[in-house]
């Protein structure tokens, strides 16, 4: 009896843990890809990248000074980036959220084709094919989205596709507070 009871107890314990983690993931409360960032509460790292759509222009962190905004790191090679794109369009057009994109490790022609096909949610897009800027932000995958407040401080980070649940819980309160104070 003991020979089967111990393995059964271990199996049931692991099954329960697995079920709990799945429930947390489905509710958006646990993201196994989420890695803490050292930038929360610190000044946003400065970058200067050529604009994807107009390479003669430079996109800088300082372009957004005085505003609450999102920085979204994306690439056409990233399935989750395609998944979140429609929601980014919603945020930019319906919620009037300023979003700066960094197109990372990508082919400019493919990125432009994606935007032409699906729409462009970005106020500006820095082109970073060699990781010149994203390394300073601690980016290790895409998509990653950062919220920067009006003082230029990084307040939130999300790894993975942005969706309504993440928007409501992590990012929207900052935009609501900024709208209330203006």
Where are these regions (language model features)?
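N-terminal targeting signals for export/organelle localization
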Residues: 1-50, 182
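Thiol/disulfide oxidoreductase modules built on the thioredoxin-like
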Residues: 4, 116-121, 128-182
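Short gly/ser/thr-rich secondary-structure transition/capping motifs
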Residues: 28-31, 50-56, 125-128
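Short loop/turn microsegments at loop-to-beta-strand junctions
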Residues: 45, 69, 142-144
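A short beta-strand-turn-helix
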Residues: 47-70
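Hydrophobic beta-strand anchors of alpha/beta hydrolase catalytic cores
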Residues: 70-71, 99
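Aromatic-flanked redox-active Cys/Sec active sites in thiol-based oxidoreductases
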Residues: 72-78, 104
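Structural microenvironment flanking redox-active thiols in thiol-disulfide oxidoreductases
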Residues: 82-119, 128-135
């Amino acid at each position: 009896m003991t020979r089967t009871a111990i393995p059964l107890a271990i199996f049931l314990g692991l099954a329960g843990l697995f079920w709990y983690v799945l429930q947390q993931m489905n509710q958006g409360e646990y993201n196994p890809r989420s890695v803490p960032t050292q930038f929360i509460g610190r000044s946003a790292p400065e970058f200067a990248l050529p604009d994807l759509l107009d390479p003669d222009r430079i996109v800088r962190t300082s372009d957004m000074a005085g505003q609450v905004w999102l920085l979204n790191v994306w690439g056409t090679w990233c399935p989750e980036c395609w998944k979140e794109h429609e929601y980014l369009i919603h945020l930019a057009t319906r919620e009037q959220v300023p979003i700066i994109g960094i197109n990372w490790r990508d082919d400019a022609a493919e990125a432009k084709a994606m935007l032409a096909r699906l729409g462009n949610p970005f106020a500006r897009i820095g082109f970073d094919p060699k990781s010149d800027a994203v390394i300073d932000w601690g980016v290790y995958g895409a998509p990653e989205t950062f919220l920067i407040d009006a003082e230029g401080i990084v307040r939130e980070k999300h790894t993975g596709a942005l969706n309504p649940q993440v928007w409501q819980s992590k990012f929207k309160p900052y935009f609501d507070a900024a709208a209330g104070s203006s």
